[in-house]
């Protein structure tokens, strides 16, 4: 199994269990998330409940709907960015990430980051923002949005910010 960590923070953000599609010249990975129900375990042990006992005081089995990727990788939602905040983040992010990339990747990154930024700016009002579990200020952002008519969110990752780790 492959796990993808944030190159800057080491937070696990994705795994190969979630197929991705490269977009924007390979700068972004698009990954489909799914709403899943967590909890509400129904245990049937075949016993007859007592008619006189009333309600059982068993465990709290409240079902909760979560997005699989957010839950599995413990992503933390952040407040939305306006255009100025987003561009400020991208500028700082480029400065932090570029020195961590190999020379050939640096060239591709510098050449194509503007296109990826414009793509994200076009969706800015529809995006949800997430960071890794550590909630580090300098970490990569993970973006989520809903495609037209979709019930499940689509996630966007900066591909160059991910470090592949074999588990």
From Swiss-Prot:
Belongs to the TCTP family. It comes from Pisum sativum (Garden pea). It is found in: Cytoplasm. GO terms for cellular component: cytoplasm. This is Translationally-controlled tumor protein homolog. Residues 1-167 form the TCTP domain. The gene is TCTP. Keywords: Calcium, Cytoplasm. It holds the Pfam family TCTP. The keyword Transferase does not apply. Induction: Induced in root tips during the externally-induced root cap cell differentiation. Involved in calcium binding and microtubule stabilization. GO terms for molecular function: calcium ion binding. The keyword Calcium applies.
């Amino acid at each position: 199994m492959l796990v993808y960590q944030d190159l800057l923070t080491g937070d696990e953000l994705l795994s190969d269990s979630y197929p991705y599609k490269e977009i924007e010249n390979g700068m972004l990975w698009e990954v489909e998330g799914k709403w899943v129900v967590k909890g509400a375990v129904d245990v049937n042990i075949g016993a007859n409940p007592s008619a006189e006992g009333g309600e059982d005081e068993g465990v709290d089995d409240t079902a909760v709907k979560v997005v699989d990727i957010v839950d599995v990788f413990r992503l933390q939602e952040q407040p939305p960015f306006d255009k100025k905040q987003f561009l400020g983040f991208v500028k700082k992010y480029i400065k932090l990430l570029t020195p961590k990339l190999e020379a050939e990747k640096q060239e591709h990154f510098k050449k194509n980051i503007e296109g990826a930024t414009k793509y994200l700016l076009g969706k800015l009002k529809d995006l949800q923002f997430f960071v890794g579990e550590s909630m580090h200020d300098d970490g990569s952002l993970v973006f989520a949005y809903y495609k037209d008519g979709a019930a499940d969110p689509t996630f966007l990752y900066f591909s160059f910010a991910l470090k592949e780790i074999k588990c």
